Amino acid sequence: MTIEIRKSAAETVIEIAGRIDTTTAPALEKAIREDIGDAKNLVLDMKAVQYISSAGLRVLLGAQKKMQKIGSMKLTNVCEEVMDVFEMTGFADILTIE
């Protein structure tokens, strides 16, 4: 998994590529925790994510809870396979997905 981060005054955009699983989820969690900065909005661009495990879902849920307190979080460019996981687990109802 690779992570690229772009920051502006309004938002932090984290571009994720690869698999989000038990091996890579801690790196994503660390990036979210350390790189949000003062931004009130977090965008997770998932156009290159082909797979997400329960460990990845846990990271997204934690990020969502954190961002609800200070602003907003949305996921963009979610592929069909990952969207299927979100729908089966109920995360499609919890997360803002565009």
Description of each model-found segment:
Residues 3-29, 48:
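STAS-typified acidic loop motif
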Residues 96-98:
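Short acidic-hydrophobic, aromatic-tinged amphipathic segments that line or gate anion-handling sites
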Residues 2-3, 34:
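Short leucine-rich amphipathic alpha-helices used at interfaces
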Residues 22-94:
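Amphipathic alpha-helical interaction surfaces in cytosolic regulatory modules
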